[in-house]
Amino acid sequence: VVLLTDGFVANGSGAWKLPKLADYPAITPPYVTPEMKDNYTPYKRNPETGVRYWAIPGQEGYMHILGGLEKDSNTGAISTDPENHNLMCHLRAEKVAKIPVPDVEVQGCADDADLLIVGFGGTYGHLYSAMEEMKKAGKKVALAHFTYLNPLPKNTEAVLKKYKKVVVAEQNLGQFAGYLRMKIDNFTPYQFNEVKGQPF
């Protein structure tokens, strides 16, 4: 798990509802099956998800090695083979790309906005407030705030290309705007970047 955060989120405060764990879907790891015993290959992956099968350490017939060095794509033995490393990098990227994430939602004048504000992370509160102030001033404005960055929601391109003007507002030097340009052909947003550690 990689958690991206920023100083505004880390040092801010606000009320939130504590979730009930019972409301979340059950987590069911892909454990090894009895058929795999004595023939277990730790890097064999589920072809649909790209996830490897889990063996509980110490189980007879499922011995394997853990470590941080690159492993053979099937056996799990340490490998320095360049072709294997290339394959493993692609397999890891494909596994992440297969993670299902919800669509990004558009708030405000979602159907007819002249301007779409895009943000992520700790910028949500002040971008939402800015959108509301602009709407009060008679402007048609919408907000798309991203929670998932990799993989991006499947509707990302459709949302971003729907509006005449898109501004990506970030509390950095524009890394998310650059990432979106890389992922979406012919996407040319305006950028609003500040690195002051203060709300916009």
Q: Model segments located where?
A:
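Flexible, low-complexity linker and terminal segments
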Residues: V2-F200
